[in-house]
A protein has these predicted regions:
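Active-site nucleophile elbow and catalytic-triad environment of alpha/beta-hydrolase enzymes
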Residues: 137, 141-163
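Conserved acidic catalytic loop of the alpha/beta-hydrolase fold
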Residues: 16-35
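Gly/Ala-rich beta-loop-alpha elbow adjacent to hydrolase catalytic centers
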Residues: 40-45, 49
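Catalytic histidine neighborhood in serine/cysteine hydrolases
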Residues: 192-207
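Short beta-strand/loop motif that positions the catalytic acidic residue
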Residues: 173-175
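Cap/lid segment of the alpha/beta-hydrolase catalytic domain
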Residues: 1-12
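Conserved alpha/beta-hydrolase "acid-adjacent" motif
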Residues: 180-190
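Alpha/beta-hydrolase-fold enzymes
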Residues: 49-136
Length: 207
């Protein structure tokens, strides 16, 4: 409402977003009883969906994870520390060029020479241009969002948390094989294997 984008909350933003997802699930269940409910999450939304599957097992009929991944634990820990320090310096809704450059900027460096700052998003140049022209898409996110997301990535990587998922909930993974969020496919395979190791019986992967 204050015109600033890319910030969840001063504290516990990740859990608050997952609570919103659960609230919407309950609302839709009341409006449409008996209708199968599938949860789709893309990119950061896939991380939130994975958190939801841990915190609210057995409450959806299936999950679709698009463009997911899992960065190495030391890198995630460093990202959380850096974003947290920048949060103290700039405030929870502040924007850090350093954090942005080390995160999303690193994705684009894989596609040099670059035509735009968002070449990594798609092979389709028209879609990249449309993204950059949309003020609701091309803004830089807050340091607290990065801090919260790094904490979320730590949470969804822990074996004891993965073990809380409903093993019978079908999960479909799909991603571009050149998507840096998924480590050019390697991170997607890693998460797929993590779900299998956690006992999930119905997981499918498409690159």
């Amino acid at each position: 409402q204050d015109g600033r984008y890319g910030a969840f909350a001063p504290q516990n933003g990740w859990k608050l977003v997952v609570a919103d997802i659960a609230r919407l699930r309950r609302i839709q269940g009341e409006k449409h009883p008996g209708v199968p409910y599938f949860l789709l999450g893309h990119s950061m939304g896939s991380f939130l969906t994975r958190t939801y599957l841990i915190d609210h097992p057995g409450t959806v009929d299936g999950a679709i994870l698009s463009g997911t991944g899992q960065e190495p634990a030391p890198l995630v820990a460093f990202g959380k520390l850096l974003a947290g320090l920048e949060c103290r310096r700039l405030g929870y809704d502040g924007v850090s060029p350093l954090v942005d450059r080390l995160s999303l900027g690193a994705y684009n460096r894989r596609f040099r020479p670059n035509r735009t700052s968002a070449d990594w998003l798609s092979r389709d140049e028209e879609q990249v241009d449309a993204y950059l022209a949309d003020p609701l898409c091309s803004h830089k996110s807050s340091v607290s969002m990065f801090r919260d997301m790094m904490g979320g990535l730590q949470y969804i990587a822990r074996r004891e948390n993965l073990a809380r998922m409903d093993p019978d909930t079908p999960v479909y993974f799909f991603s571009g094989d050149q998507d840096p969020v998924g480590g050019m496919g390697k991170g997607v395979h890693k998460v797929y294997a993590m779900f299998q190791a956690a006992g999930c019986r119905d997981v499918t992967l498409k690159l």
